[in-house]
């Protein structure tokens, strides 16, 4: 049985903060998350959040026993049963939270429902929705029929804003934390010079939920020894020490999100992390170069969605962009290249939630393929 994250005692921390656990639901290998040296099932961690949401809703509207529940078209996972596993886990958690009548509804379709509700007079029969959120990239193609619609195709891949944030962390932060630096230390009869083994730190730094596990001697000892030797690059390892000791990865990712948002409206922005005395300027052009490979995946997934619908790009009347990452100018550019003059932006951060509420009110259901 695999446990996600090293089984080390984290009793010195005030708590463990988890984000993006939805991304783990479809991974059969991820069965437990460690909290204060105790393994918790994913379902056990998700249930209290869902219970709190239900109770908050009931405080305003009364008893809630059923709901339309959003999910990505394809959960992240390693096999063909990832969606089945994820929906089973999610359904179990909702059940424990008191939501017994469950109607799973794909998130891009929910976003499209929200758009059509707000824009009933929008012209066009065929609508394509791109929902580019934090963890997944989802698509749907709908055909409008009066006041109703039919689902022509859905598609989704495991790519989201969180993946772009990790790329920025690697490209911008790693060189400033000691990657590529030399490590000189005294051997038995001579001085030994090697590259500092930064690769051992990389995955834990960019997965901030488990960055705290770097507070073990196997990681901290070489960092402190490298600082003690002095010389060029010492400040970089002092930064690495501070990131580890003060568990700063989450804070840095928050600053990266701010940087990314700024580059959606201006050509140059600054990543400012005063906690480790670091400022890095980044141009939109360089940002787009860094995320060139994910952008290619976006383009390929977009074209695959149109192909699955049995359509050509010219057959699409309305192209709806939603989700925070849809605001990235390069993503907008991909849409405009293929659907010039037909791209609209809609409520990037709450369209899915609004659409789920509307779909539930109207009794809209989605039959699982």
Enumerate the predicted regions with their spans.
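Phosphate-binding glycine-rich/basic clefts of nucleotide- and phosphate-handling proteins
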Residues: 144-275
């Amino acid at each position: 049985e695999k446990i996600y994250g090293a089984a080390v005692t984290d009793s010195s921390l005030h708590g463990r903060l988890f984000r993006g656990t939805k991304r783990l639901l479809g991974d059969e290998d991820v069965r437990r998350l460690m909290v204060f040296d105790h393994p918790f099932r994913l379902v056990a961690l998700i249930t209290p959040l869902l219970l709190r949401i239900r109770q908050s809703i009931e405080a305003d509207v009364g008893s809630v026993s059923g709901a339309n529940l959003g999910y990505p078209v394809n959960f992240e996972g390693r096999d063909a049963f990832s969606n089945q596993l994820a929906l089973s886990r999610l359904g179990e958690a909702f059940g424990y939270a008191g939501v017994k009548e469950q109607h799973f509804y794909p998130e891009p379709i929910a976003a499209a429902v929200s758009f059509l509700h707000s824009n009933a007079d929008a012209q066009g029969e065929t609508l394509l929705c791109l929902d580019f959120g934090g963890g997944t990239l989802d698509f749907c193609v709908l055909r409008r029929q009066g006041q109703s619609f039919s689902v022509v195709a859905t598609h989704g891949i495991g790519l989201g804003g969180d993946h772009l944030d990790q790329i920025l962390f690697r490209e911008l932060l790693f060189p400033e934390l000691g990657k590529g630096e030399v490590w000189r230390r005294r051997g038995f009869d001579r001085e030994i010079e090697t590259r500092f083994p930064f690769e051992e730190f990389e995955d834990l730094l960019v997965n901030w939920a488990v960055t705290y596990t770097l507070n073990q001697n196997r990681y901290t000892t070489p960092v402190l020894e490298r600082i003690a030797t002095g010389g060029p690059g010492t400040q970089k390892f002092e930064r690495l020490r501070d990131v580890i000791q003060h568990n700063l990865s989450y804070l840095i990712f928050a600053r990266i999100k701010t940087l990314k948002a700024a580059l959606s409206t201006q050509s140059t922005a600054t990543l400012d992390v005063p906690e480790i005395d670091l400022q890095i300027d980044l141009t939109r052009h360089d940002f787009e170069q860094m995320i060139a490979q994910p952008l290619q995946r976006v383009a390929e997934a977009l074209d695959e969605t149109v192909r699955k619908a049995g359509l050509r790009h010219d057959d699409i009347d309305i192209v709806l962009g939603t989700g925070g990452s849809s605001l990235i100018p390069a993503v907008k550019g991909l849409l405009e290249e293929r659907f010039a003059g037909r791209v609209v932006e809609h409520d990037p951060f709450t369209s899915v939630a609004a659409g789920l509420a509307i779909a539930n009110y109207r009794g809209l259901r989605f039959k699982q393929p």
